[in-house]
């Protein structure tokens, strides 16, 4: 039986996708170093090595949800215009647009969440835990657990991939990096929803 902790460690060490890590560990009978070799042989451990390389080519793409209710504009960068023009890269960018439209992330990664937002969220979560009657000595642990949930809901890279909840968007990104052999960066996005921020008034 392969533990979730082993899969997580292998993923952190290689940058490969979660399912690829699990398969490699099963193939290696749980041997971490052997699993790393398996991933390297398959070219799936390359993502981490490419992360430091400059990515200034790429695409700006748009997605409009049927009915014109939601629109997304996203910029995704890669290293060369050759890769930017491949169907694989274009499909990846389109998938990211659709993910943003469906899952409504606020940030790309947890590092992008402003400290003030985190502090406010912690205050609210702490008050909730205390109001639920949780003991003071476990409140901090509960709050940190809920902050992790906040990251998974609001940070694009940590969200479950809409087409395969077994993967995160980060897994999808790393798999695409491994396939295309270049660093890929989701640079920025904006999401519009019709009527968002407009106060509606009802006539009695």
Swiss-Prot record:
It holds the Pfam family EF_TS. This is Elongation factor Ts. GO terms for cellular component: cytoplasm. Keywords: Cytoplasm, Elongation factor, Protein biosynthesis. Its main location: cytoplasm. The keyword Oxidoreductase does not apply. It is found in: Cytoplasm. Belongs to the EF-Ts family. Residues 80-83 are annotated as: Involved in Mg(2+) ion dislocation from EF-Tu. Gene3D superfamilies: 1.10.286.20, DNA helicase RuvA subunit, C-terminal domain (1.10.8.10), Elongation factor Ts, dimerisation domain (3.30.479.20). InterPro entries: EF-Ts_dimer_sf, Transl_elong_EFTs/EF1B, Transl_elong_EFTs/EF1B_dimer, Transl_elong_Ts_CS, UBA-like_sf. Associates with the EF-Tu.GDP complex and induces the exchange of GDP to GTP. It remains bound to the aminoacyl-tRNA.EF-Tu.GTP complex up to the GTP hydrolysis stage on the ribosome. HAMAP family: EF_Ts (MF_00050). GO terms for molecular function: translation elongation factor activity.
């Amino acid at each position: 039986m392969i533990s979730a902790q082993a899969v997580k460690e292998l993923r952190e060490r290689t940058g490969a996708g979660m399912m690829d890590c699990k398969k490699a560990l099963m193939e290696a009978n749980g041997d971490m170093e052997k699993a790393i070799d398996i991933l390297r042989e398959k070219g799936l451990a390359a993502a981490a090595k490419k992360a430091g390389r400059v990515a200034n080519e790429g695409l700006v793409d748009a997605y409009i949800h049927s009915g014109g209710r939601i629109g997304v504009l996203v910029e995704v960068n890669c290293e060369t215009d050759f890769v930017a023009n491949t169907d694989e890269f274009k499909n990846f960018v389109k998938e990211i647009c659709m993910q943003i439209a469906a899952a409504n992330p606020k940030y790309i990664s947890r590092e992008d969440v402003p400290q003030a937002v985190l502090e406010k969220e912690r205050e609210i979560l702490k008050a909730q835990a205390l109001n639920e009657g949780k003991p003071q000595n476990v409140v901090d642990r509960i709050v940190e657990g809920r902050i992790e949930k906040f990251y998974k809901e609001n940070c694009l890279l940590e969200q479950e991939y809409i087409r395969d909840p077994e993967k995160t968007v980060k897994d999808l990104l790393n798999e695409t990096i491994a396939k295309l052999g270049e660093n890929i960066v989701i640079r920025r996005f904006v999401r519009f929803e019709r009527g968002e921020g407009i106060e509606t008034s009802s006539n009695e």
